[in-house]
Curated annotation (Swiss-Prot):
Protein name according to UniProt: Large ribosomal subunit protein uL14c
Subunit structure: Part of the 50S ribosomal subunit.
Organism: Platanus occidentalis
Entry keywords, A to Z: Chloroplast, Plastid, Ribonucleoprotein, Ribosomal protein, RNA-binding, rRNA-binding
Gene behind this protein: rpl14
Function: Binds to 23S rRNA.
Length: 122
């Protein structure tokens, strides 16, 4: 469960390393974000000499959470970290690579480009 002020790792090569959630896109009063939700975040740590810089406000989609994700078939998935992929206004990833495993639910939420870049889909 991701809420405002939560720090997340970045799972792509866009130039950001760490994000902090400042808003959850969707209903006006949503408290938590889960896998597949789009958030507004600020970059807390960035790689030098890259297009994205520290303190820049961006959008990101959550791809991994420490909180368990329960599927309809009873399977429970839990990751070791909270991670997100930086996206643009159209929902396309800004990076060209995605690191680590991501959940299959992203394909159903029309983030197919992120799924195709991922090395492993659980």
């Amino acid at each position: 469960m991701i809420q405002p002020q939560t720090h997340l790792n970045v799972a792509d090569n866009s130039g950001a390393r760490e994000l902090m959630c400042i808003r959850i896109i969707g209903a006006s009063n949503r408290r938590y974000a889960h896998i597949g939700d789009v958030i507004v975040a600020v970059i807390k740590e960035a790689v030098p000499n890259m297009p994205l810089e520290r303190s820049e406000v961006i959008r990101a989609v959550i791809v991994r959470t420490c909180k368990e994700l329960k599927r309809d078939n009873g399977m429970i998935i839990r990751y070791d970290d909270n991670a997100a992929v930086v996206i643009d206004q159209e929902g396309n990833p800004k990076g060209t690579r995605v690191f680590g495993a991501i959940a299959r639910e992203l394909r159903q939420l029309s983030f197919t480009k992120i799924v195709s870049l991922a090395p492993e889909v659980l």
